[in-house]
Swiss-Prot record:
This is Kunitz serine protease inhibitor Pr-mulgin 1. Residues 1-24 form the signal peptide. Keywords: Disulfide bond, Protease inhibitor, Secreted, Serine protease inhibitor, Signal, Toxin. CDD domains: Kunitz_textilinin-like. One of its GO terms (molecular function) is serine-type endopeptidase inhibitor activity. The keyword Signal applies. Negative results: does not inhibit serine proteases (trypsin, chymotrypsin, elastase, kallikrein, plasmin and pepsin), cysteine protease (cathepsin G), and MMP (1, 3, 7, 8, 9, 10, 12, 13, and 14), as well as voltage-gated potassium channels (Shaker, Shal, Shaw, and rKv1.1/KCNA1). Does not inhibit vasopressin V2 receptor (V2R/AVPR2). It comes from Pseudechis rossignolii. SMART domains: KU. Pfam families: Kunitz_BPTI (PF00014).
Length: 83
């Protein structure tokens, strides 16, 4: 296979990995945690996975501590937790 063909294959595999949803058995356990703004007083938009609604939702993050179910972008939340 030519180097161009290998590069195309690598690109397609990477795209497939990014776009493939996480199955519930592969979902990290921290995705079940509730949204936690943390103790700080910042007003940052963040996203968390809501297991009841089975989707990523917005919430206000204080900027420190909180829990691992806190994402800067909805894409990162979906990639990590959404089924």
């Amino acid at each position: 296979m030519s180097s161009g063909g290998l590069l195309l294959l690598l690109g397609l595999l990477t795209l497939w990995e990014v776009l493939t949803p996480v199955s519930s058995k592969d979902r990290p356990r921290f995705c079940e945690l509730p949204a936690d703004p943390g103790p700080c007083n910042g007003l940052f938009q963040a996203f968390y996975y809501n297991p009841v609604q089975r989707k990523c939702l917005k919430f206000r993050y204080g900027g420190c501590k909180g829990n691992p179910n806190t994402f800067k972008t909805i894409e990162e939340c979906k990639r990590t937790c959404a089924a």
